[in-house]
Amino acid sequence: VHRYGFGFTVITKSPLILRDLELLQAVNTKAKCVIQMTLTTYDDSLCEILEPNVAVTSERFTVLKTLRDAGIPTVVWLTPILPFINDTVENLEGILQYCIEAKVRGIICFGMGLTLRDGNREYFYKKLDTAFPGLKEQYIQRYGTRYSVMSPHNTRLMNIFHARCKENGIETNPDVIFAYLSAFDKIPGKTNAQLELF
């Protein structure tokens, strides 16, 4: 990627991305490198329940700050938000504060909720029974077999999300973010040129 001047982006939850920090910086100097990271839960204890076997949110925040200091742009995916679990103002504000401090370029969020396909739903409910006894019944009663499972607080949370991001210069329009990810204007031997990656 670096040798031929291509841009690079990856979605990760792992601090291991920092093993290649110098290479990522080199790619970003020649073309463009953007690291995307998923943040779901501000509270690390809850994160360990919802996202076992991956780095907790505070560790990912450290990665985002390291990338910031290295001059590498970042984008955060705010998903999934689970109704009755992490769909709180406190959780959202905590994640947004991390993003503000890390100076992320954009946050992708398609709403405060999640999607459940047939097959996934059964697995999800099984995990709910284990970690949050009794909550499965609330989901079944409220959402039935819906594919889109939105928080009852979606409107309020999305208003906070957009307001806080606007105040801090963080892009929230997915189309704008995806366009940013797929184009770069640093082409070896050319000035002020723009190349579409895809």
Residue ranges and their predicted role:
Residues 1-142, 146:
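Conserved AdoMet/S-adenosylmethionine-binding subsite of the radical SAM
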Residues 125-198:
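C-terminal accessory extensions appended to soluble enzyme cores
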